[in-house]
Amino acid sequence: YYTGARSQEALDLETEMLPVPDDDHAVGVLRQIRSKGKRRDLYAPMFLIRELYAFVYEPDAADKKRKYVFVAEKSNYAGRQLTYHAAYDMMRRTQECLGMEFHFHDLRHTFCTGLIEQGVDTAIVQQVMGHAHLYTTKRYVHLSDRDVMAHLTDYGEQWKGGVYHDIC
């Protein structure tokens, strides 16, 4: 969720892509991840990088030289890259436990929508999400009635106060 990564981008993360956790920065960059046949950078909060780093390099990790961050644990496939099917099955079981329906892409969508709602510039959101075109990013914009009313109230107050009076 915290990166807006596509499901396959997350599954393709290699351990060598993880930066060493750094206390001087709030955000880290995972360089040159595979994405839709291209390469892009993935931005992640430092707390997540610390968690991933600990997960991959924990002292009791069965396979300390694994190539991928997310690997299978079952004996026949232990240490191999986790497949989309296996990840999807884990997501399905999680849905059943929580009693709610959601999909991998919902996490990406929610992250992107949250950035937009917080007022992050759409050009930055575009880069963070790895969108080639701004119109793709704009598809994630879902304004609530509350958001629209708040902005129109501010706009109305400016008119009422005479800020735009000289224009007419």
Language-model features, listed with the residues they occupy:
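Conserved tyrosine-mediated DNA breakage-rejoining catalytic core shared by Y-recombinases
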Residues: T3, Q8, D12-E51
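Short, cationic motifs built from Arg/Lys/His that form the positively charged side of catalytic pockets
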Residues: R6, R40, L52-A61, R108
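Helix-turn-helix DNA-binding elements, focusing on the entry/boundary residues of the two helices
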Residues: S7, T122, L134
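The alpha-helix within a helix-turn-helix
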Residues: L11, Q126, K138
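Active-site/catalytic core of tyrosine-dependent DNA strand-transfer enzymes
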Residues: M46-M100
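Short, basic (Lys/Arg/His-rich) helix/loop patches that form interaction surfaces
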Residues: Y88-Q127, H131
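Catalytic-site neighborhood detector that most strongly recognizes the C-terminal catalytic loop/helix
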Residues: M129, H133-D154
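C-terminal secondary-structure termini that scaffold catalytic or DNA-interacting sites
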Residues: G156-C168
